[in-house]
């Protein structure tokens, strides 16, 4: 039997809601990717967050991860994140820089406002050539906010999970 983990990064909570639903439907353990320096989660400051995300991306920053993630203890790992500037947040690059996913199965999922996965699933395949990367779930942010249950159930069914 596979030992499953759902890890996610979320500022506004939509990736978190989706992660929680995946963990619920699969029985996987659940862990948040916590940045060393927290992002402002106030929706009133969305534009400031967008500018910061763009700056991190343009400068190739790798924000530090505060918590230890027990990647080595799991066989199958769901990785979730929001889309920022048509890609994943730079802290996800930090995740792939810090942890070895060789021999693991990675199942990505993301929330978005129209950009689908933005090619991030292919980027994960490039960053982690020793891992098996399953087809991901891009879920529109408003759909996630209304409840990701159906989308998650259908996606997991297509994956045979």
Map each language-model feature to its residues.
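Residue-level recognition of beta-strand->loop/alpha-helix junctions
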Residues: 32-34, 110, 137-138
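N-terminal beta1-alpha1-beta2 submodule of the flavodoxin-like/Rossmannoid cofactor-binding fold
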Residues: 1-79, 86-88, 93, 97, ...
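Structural beta-sheet core signal
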Residues: 6, 79, 108-110, 135
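Short, charged, surface-exposed secondary-structure boundary motifs
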Residues: 39-43, 118, 143-146
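Glycine-rich, charge-decorated loop segments at or immediately adjacent to ligand/cofactor-binding or catalytic sites
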Residues: 114-127
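Glycine-rich phosphate/pyrophosphate-binding loop and the adjoining helix
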Residues: 132-161
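Short beta-alpha junction loops
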Residues: 110-115, 141
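Short, conserved loop/helix-junction motifs that constitute active-site signature segments
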Residues: 71-72, 97-103, 126-129
